[in-house]
């Protein structure tokens, strides 16, 4: 098992979450209707993202004994890898305008890059970062090189 195909984000309000991500520029495909979606898939390159109602996602994990829905930092961050420091700034401003909360203003990082963090409407942490030496493949996915 050496790939990750889909990340599903449980959301408290799928309609509001959908609007938020549309404002960030994501193209989506809705199963159901716009006012009552069942699931929403992002039509992004690379690993796909989906939005699904949080309580329904917990039941999907275990219908008889769904996991508790927690608040706070889950130990997971999602990342958008930018191609310039200016793009980092632009993405963070766009996220904030769409309703995100900036958790860390963009700054030079201890690993030599530049980045910041925001939380989306459901509290998921998103890193927006840039590295001078980063290279991207034809799908705009970061190339991870062996050292």
PLM region descriptions:
Residues 38-40, 60, 113-114, 141:
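Short secondary-structure boundary/hinge segments and terminal tails
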Residues 3-12, 40-41, 64-147:
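Vicinal oxygen chelate
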Residues 35, 58-65, 135-138:
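A short, acidic/glycine-rich surface segment
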Residues 8-58:
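Core segments of cupin and vicinal oxygen chelate
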Residues 1-19, 30, 75-80, 132-147:
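N-terminal beta-strand motif that seeds the catalytic metal site of vicinal oxygen chelate
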């Amino acid at each position: 098992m050496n790939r990750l195909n889909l990340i599903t984000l449980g959301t408290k309000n799928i309609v509001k979450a959908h609007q938020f991500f549309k404002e960030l520029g994501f193209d989506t495909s809705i199963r159901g209707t716009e006012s009552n979606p069942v699931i929403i898939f992002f039509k992004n390159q690379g690993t796909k993202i989906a939005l699904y109602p949080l309580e329904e996602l917990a039941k999907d994990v275990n219908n008889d004994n769904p996991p508790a829905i927690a608040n706070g930092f889950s130990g997971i961050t999602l990342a958008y890898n930018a191609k310039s420091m200016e793009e980092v700034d632009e993405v963070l401003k766009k996220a904030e305008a769409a309703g995100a909360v900036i958790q860390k203003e963009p700054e030079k990082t201890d690993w030599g890059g530049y980045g910041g963090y925001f939380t989306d409407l459901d509290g998921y942490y998103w890193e927006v970062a840039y590295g001078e030496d980063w290279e991207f493949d034809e799908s705009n996915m970061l190339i991870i090189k062996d050292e």
